[in-house]
Every structure is written in structure tokens, then in C-alpha cells.
A protein has these predicted regions:
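Ser/Thr/Pro/Gly-rich low-complexity linker/stalk segments immediately outside membranes or between
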Residues: 26-42
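A general structural motif
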Residues: 44-50, 71-74
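Second-shell loop/turn segments in exported
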Residues: 40-45, 66-69, 92-96, 155-159
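Secretory targeting signatures
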Residues: 1-26
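Primarily the HKD phosphodiesterase
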Residues: 17-18, 56-115
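DNA replication sliding-clamp ring fold and its partner-interaction surfaces
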Residues: 50-53, 57-64, 168-169, 173
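N-terminal post-signal-peptidase region of extra-cytosolic proteins
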Residues: 47, 51-53, 115-121
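HKD (HxKxxxxD) catalytic microenvironment of the phospholipase D
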Residues: 65, 117-173
Length: 182
């Protein structure tokens, strides 16, 4: 084998070894690598697994989960947020002021020690449906975190893998958070 072929073979083996190490690292640490260009996932309901997708990404959080949610009644998503909080993840949620009673998960999250605020927009509602995870992942769409959205309504959920998009959503989250009541 000549030197050129040997160099190419060593290079290819090195690439494969690096890819395998990356996969193993991801599997064992639960950490994911940010793609170089934005990518996304699209989900639909009813019965499209939107709630499972939200729970999956909450479970992958390593640092922070910031949520702006109009209506939030899904127990499994609340439990996933509590589990993340118990793992030491910073969890903050802003609810619309009209949605903190009744079937809302507000009381459960508050009793678990999660930082909560009520939007104080005097001229309308806080109609966002957004979660920002680790400043890298944005979950958004028409999907309220409710049983109706999961099982009855025609809804959409988009998971955006983009530091730039997450930064823009995080800026809006911080703006609303700073103007909300705790």
C-alpha cells in the first residue's frame, strides 16, 4: 500500500471512530450535539404524540427549561417538569393570568418549588405556547399543553433545533418574565 492510500485509510478510520464516540457519548450522557444548521421536527395532533415529544425533550434538558404557556393541564408534562427540577434543571414557567386556577397544573408546579409567574399584560392574554430548552431547542406551535390538544383538536407542534431561534425566543421569555408577577 502506498503512502497516499495509507493516509486516506487512517483518515477514514479516524472519522468513523469520531462518529462512533459521538454516538456513544450521546447515548450515555443524554447530551445531544447541536447541528451546524437549524433543523426541526413537526408533529400533529390529535393522537400524534405531541405530549410525548414535549416530555422527551424536557427529559433531555441539561441546564434550563423556560416555558410560556397559555393553557397547561397535561399531568405528564407537569410531572416531567418536576422531574427536571428535581434533577437540578432551572425550570421557569409563565402562565396567562386567567389560567392559574381550575384544571391548570399551576398549583402542582408551585408545590414542587418551580418558579412560576403570571403574565400581567393589561391589554390581552399571554397566548404563547413555547418552551426553550438549554438555549438550543424551541418547542412551539398551536399546541396548548392540554388533553384536548393531545386527543381531540387539530394542532401542530414544532421542535426547532437552533441556537439562534432559541436566543430570540429566550429574549421574549425574559421580557415577559420580567414584567410578570411572581
Amino acid at each position: 500500500m502506498n503512502d497516499r492510500k495509507l493516509i486516506i485509510a487512517v483518515f477514514v478510520v479516524g472519522l468513523l471512530f469520531g462518529a462512533i464516540l459521538g454516538i456513544v457519548y450521546s447515548m450515555y450522557t443524554g447530551r445531544y450535539l447541536q447541528p451546524s444548521s437549524p433543523s426541526y421536527e413537526i408533529h400533529f395532533s390529535p393522537n400524534g404524540g405531541c405530549a410525548d415529544t414535549i416530555v422527551f425533550w424536557i427529559g433531555r434538558a441539561n441546564q434550563s427549561i423556560h416555558v410560556l404557556m397559555y393553557i397547561f393541564t397535561l399531568q405528564n408534562v407537569a410531572e416531567a417538569l418536576i422531574s427536571a427540577h428535581d434533577r437540578g434543571i432551572e425550570v421557569k414557567v409563565v402562565f396567562d393570568k386567567s389560567q392559574i386556577a381550575g384544571y391548570s397544573q399551576y398549583a402542582l408546579l408551585k408545590s414542587a418549588g418551580i418558579e412560576l409567574r403570571n403574565d400581567t399584560n393589561p391589554s390581552g392574554i399571554m397566548h404563547n405556547k413555547v418552551a426553550i430548552i438549554d438555549n438550543r431547542i424551541v418547542i412551539t406551535g398551536s399546541f396548548n399543553w392540554t388533553n384536548s390538544a393531545e386527543n381531540s383538536n387539530n394542532e401542530n407542534l414544532i421542535v426547532i433545533h437552533s441556537v439562534d431561534a432559541a436566543s430570540r425566543y429566550e429574549s421574549e421569555f425574559q421580557n415577559i418574565w420580567s414584567q410578570s408577577q411572581g
